[in-house]
Regions:
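Conserved alpha-helical positions within TPR/SEL1-like repeat arrays
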Residues: 256, 260-263, 292-305, 330-345
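Amphipathic alpha-helical segments of the small helical/lid subdomains adjacent to P-loop NTPase cores
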Residues: 33-76, 90, 168
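Extended alpha-helical scaffolding segments used for macromolecular assembly and cargo binding
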Residues: 207-295, 309
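A conserved switch/coupling segment of P-loop NTPase cores
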Residues: 1-50
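C-terminal boundary/linker of central alpha/beta nucleotide-binding cores
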Residues: 75-82, 125-201, 208-209
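Amphipathic alpha-helical segments of tetratricopeptide repeats
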Residues: 279-284, 316-323
């Protein structure tokens, strides 16, 4: 990864102790500082900046939990309560709604790295994590990292999904502290970093098309299994929840290709999530095609436990397509095969032969 231009200069000062966000200083004796998980200690930190902390202790503790025990965020929240017009209850509600509270316009003063500045609470969080200083490529990586499960995924697998030629950019993000990693080279985002990255990069179908295309290719490899399928499905679930749907046709195709692959693993939670998403989207008449609506009914039939209802759903799916064309012929053939299979399984061989 790229080295900071000032690091070698700083090291020449023969520092006894150097505090840094770098995590790759193998040639030195290092001690990793992690978040303080003891809420009593963080409450003491809050009390140092907020004079009425004891009066509102239960609410203050909820604020600490909401900002994920991040000490700088706790300090900012305390100063905002001391100097602003928000009550603890109001601030908690706003944090729970927007986490990194963009709308709170109360100005507070903070000193970080010897520099004094005034900004809103949200701007301070951005200043701390310096998202604006990232290169465009690194911002794109952060944008796509938002979809990873909290448990993370292999850095090499993720790099392959994004078609990155090397791990250099990811390693840079690890060294600056934006990306968390383990000894097994699993990468993930801290929850608060994820929230800020989501707000700042605004992941969309069009901006994350490389990731979606890569996941879709995996899902189209019928008969081929991947060892990390659980993390794959968690990533798809996060995409459904978080992505901006600015290219509906591409997004529908992504969902429709993911569903059968989940079916191979009997991943009913993910399958139900896709059905719910498609149902919501296709309620709008000008969204989707007859084939999209037929596929939705076919997916619903796949998870239906009652044979009669499953058969009706497959019939309804076929009824969606009035004219068979080159574009929908394969779908119609599959729908007939599925309906025939249901008839055969339920003791109707004559009806089954009509469709198989």
């Amino acid at each position: 990864a790229t080295q900071d231009s000032f690091l070698s200069v700083v090291l020449k000062y023969r520092c006894q102790i150097l505090f840094t966000t770098r995590s790759n200083l193998n040639e030195y004796c290092t001690f990793q500082l992690k978040e303080i998980q003891d809420i009593n200690i963080l409450f003491q930190l809050t009390s140092a900046f907020y004079s009425e902390a004891d009066k509102y202790r239960s609410t203050v503790e909820k604020i600490i939990e909401t900002v994920h025990y991040h000490t700088f965020a706790v300090e900012l929240a305390a100063k905002l309560l001391e100097n602003g017009i928000s009550t603890p209850g109001q601030l908690l509600a706003k944090l729970q709604e927007e986490r990194a509270s963009r709308d709170n316009e109360d100005k507070i003063k903070i000193i970080k790295d010897g520099q004094s500045s005034k900004a809103t609470y949200y701007s301070h969080i951005h200043t701390l994590f310096s998202l604006y200083a990232l290169s465009r490529k690194q911002q794109d990586i952060m944008c796509n990292l938002c979809f990873l499960p909290y448990t993370g995924i292999s850095a090499r697998i993720f790099a392959k999904w994004l078609e990155l030629p090397t791990l250099n950019e990811i390693n840079d993000l690890i060294e600056t502290g934006f990306v968390q990693t383990t000894t097994r080279h699993t990468i993930s985002l801290h929850p608060m970093i994820k929230e800020i990255a989501l707000s700042e990069t605004k992941p969309s179908v069009s901006s994350c098309h490389i990731l979606l295309d890569s996941l879709q290719k995996i899902c189209l490899m019928h008969g081929m299994e991947v060892a990390y399928y659980k993390k794959l499905f968690q990533t798809i679930g996060n995409i459904i929840e978080l992505i901006e749907k600015d290219d509906i046709p591409k997004y529908l195709l992504f969902l429709e290709n993911a569903f059968p692959y989940m079916d191979n693993y009997n991943h009913h939670k993910g399958m139900n999530g896709i059905i719910q998403e498609l149902t919501g989207l296709l309620k709008t008449k000008n969204i989707g095609t007859d084939s999209d609506r037929a596929l939705l009914l076919d997916f619903q039939a796949t998870l239906e436990t009652k044979p009669e209802k499953a058969i009706k759903l497959e019939k309804d799916a076929l009824a969606q397509i009035e004219t068979i064309t080159a574009d929908n012929a394969r779908l119609v053939s599959n729908l007939h095969a599925n309906l025939g299979g249901l008839y055969r399984m339920n003791g109707h061989p004559d009806l089954a032969r009509e469709h198989m």
